[in-house]
C-alpha cells in the first residue's frame, strides 16, 4: 500500500505523513460553539474529520482523536441572557442536540471531547507562561492580550504579513491594546455578566479568549507537540494562526506538524453563513433527506474543495446512493476479511492515501457496483460493502434503505402498509386477469415514487425512487 500523503496547509503542499511516534497519531480538531443547532457547515467538518480518523485507523494507526466543545464565549452568554436561562442549561441542551445530529450522520464520537470550561486552570497556566516569556501583558482595561509583533513567525500558517494586516479587518481596534492586532487571552469580567460567565484568576475575574481554549486543551490532552490539527478553512486565520503563536510562544517548540482544513459550503456560489442568511441546519436538511444521503453528499466532494449545497445536488446524491444499495440487493456478501491485495481495494486505498481523495474512492465503489450487478458475485458484494463501510456508508440492509421515505418525515409519502396493500390489490387483479387494473396500480405507485419489480415465482419487490 502506498504511503499516506496529506495536504499540509502549513507547507502549502502534499507531504508524506510521518507521525511523531511510529504507529500512533494524535489529532485535534476545532469543534462547535454550542449556542444553536448545527448547520451544514458544521456537518461538513464533522463528516470530514470522521473520515480522516476512520482512514487512519483502517491503515493501522492507533489514533487519539480530540475534538473540543466551546461552551463559553460572548455568543453563548448573549443567547443565554436572551433566553433567560443559565449558560450551562443552554450549552448542555445544544451539546445533546449536536450528539443527536452526529449519530444521525454516522459520526463516530472522538476519543476525547473536552469542554472549554473544564480546562480553565490549564488556560490560565498557559497565559502565565506567555506572560513570563514576554508575549502577554495586562492592558489598562483589565484584559490580558497577546503581543503579536513579539512572535517572529506570526503569519506562517496563513501567509499573512503583519504589515499588511489592517486593524478592524478581523479584530476591532482597542485603545487599551499596545497594538491593534494584539488579541485577547483573558477577558476581564463585566459587571452585568451572568452566573457561570467568569472565573477567578491572578488577573481578576474573567473568562478565556477563544484562541487560548484550543491551545490549552490540545497541549494538555495530546502533548505540546502533536501530529495533526484540523478545522474549517475559515479557522485558518486568525484562530489557528493565533493558536500557533500562543502554543509555540508558551512552549518554545513546534505545536503541530500537519494542518488540515476543509473547504467552505456554498449556496449559489456564496459561502454559507449566518450573516448572509443562507444557512440550513442539519435538522432542516434531515426533514427532507435521509441522513446517509446527506453524508454521501458531503463525502463525494474532496474535503478541500468547495461543497455546493442545493436540492439538485442532494437529489443526485440520493440517486447515486440508491444505485449502490440496489447493487447489493439479493446478493449475500461472503464473510471473508478485506484483502488489500484485491484490485478494487488497492485502487480505493491509493485514492484515500492521496490526501483522502474520496471522489476517486467513490468512483471505485461504482466500478464494484457495476461488476456486482453483472455477476451477482458474493466476494465483490463483500468488497463493496467493506470499502463503503470505511466511509461510513452502506451499513444498512439494502431493502431498509430502498424502501424508506426520502426524509425523516416526508409529507405525503405512502407508508409501507399502504404500499403493501396496493401491491396485494395488484396481485389480486392479476389473478383475476384484470391486467388493466394491475397496470393502473403499478402506474399509481410509480407516480407516488414507488417502483415495482416482479420476481420469478410471482412475488413483487418494491423500492422508492
Swiss-Prot record:
Cofactor binding note of this UniProt entry: Binds 1 zinc ion per subunit.
Motif window: 'KMSKS' region: 271-275
EC number: 6.1.1.16
Statement: the UniProt record of this protein carries the keyword Zinc: yes
Motif ('HIGH' region): 32-42
Quaternary state and interactors: Monomer.
Similarity section: Belongs to the class-I aminoacyl-tRNA synthetase family.
Protein name stated in the entry: Cysteine--tRNA ligase
Upper lineage: Bacteria, Pseudomonadati, Pseudomonadota, Betaproteobacteria, Burkholderiales
